[in-house]
């Protein structure tokens, strides 16, 4: 049995098996290169670590060169967390109505101090609710206008953040205006007011607003609905209180938290 292995032959790295030359490199190996077989002649290759991996080559001692593979825990952890966060945001965005998506985009474009966070919550209202309370000039700035149709509690993920709020309420009344008022618990007046209209048939009355948040304690909002100066308003029902087409109607209110960027 003759010599076999890798040898330097006329400044070229050659592969020998039993004194038979099997292949010849086109150029000498450089520092930290390896010989890699191909479909034709061997070629020089270098090991490269991708995200989350480390490669340490020790070749100062020609008699005991080593290659150590290990995991870069910090990089791998960040990579995994980033993918999880992206998946969460993608799932959240998929469930948001198109109108709210546009509201979020418009808000972020106009205020570059804001960025998306993962805090999103949606509430559905399917009960038929009769709203006998009215909104008038004398009570529009108080907590007495309209009828409360629901309370909604949100726990912020961040301090100094902001809630983007979107409400789509199915309302009916004998022809006239419908008023929606959003009240934050602890306030003495509504933090947002919106208006809709019904001509005796169901209509979607919407409220869009942004509300500042300062801490991480739970925040409770209530939504009040009523007629402007006169009239009974029905939520999720016809103007006479009957079901719409004999089915259950559902109104929604969504809260999306955004926060200030900390990376410029």
UniProtKB/Swiss-Prot annotation:
The keyword Transmembrane does not apply. The keyword Isomerase does not apply. Keywords: Plasmid. InterPro entries: Chlamydia_pGP3, PGP3-D_N, pGP3_C. This is Virulence plasmid protein pGP3-D. It comes from Chlamydia psittaci. The lineage of its organism: Bacteria, Pseudomonadati, Chlamydiota, Chlamydiia, Chlamydiales.
